[in-house]
Amino acid sequence: SSRPIMLYFAYGSNLHHFQMKRRCKDSIFIKKINLKNFRLTFRSKYRAADIEPKKNSIVPGALFEISKSDEKKLDIYEDFPILYKKHYFFYNRKKVMTYTMVKKSQFRFPTERYLNIVKRGYKDCNLNTKFLKKALIQ
């Protein structure tokens, strides 16, 4: 069985519920959470979302339950371990996985298409867009 067995934190395009469900068929949206002491940014030639440590800052995102096969699909989508590596943190004593870019290149404004997917995800998860707007004016 491929029942959901791990927790995943989405903060970029995977916040988009329809896209996430299409990519990871076993995924279940649990709730919105804030990752503390990190901030959102966009970088690389893909102009994609990334997170980096920053004191007293937060990254709003979504907690999903995913299966092992979902994780494999995400690994492919995130180009793990070339573009993104895995970062683990604890939320209410439970281990959560997320992705963070390997190369911390400079800020690059995302494409309109990508940004629209992220914005839709913020709506889907009912997240505060204040932090997204802040990330776009670096």
Regions found by a protein language model. Give the residues of each.
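Glycine-aromatic micro-motifs
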Residues: 4-138
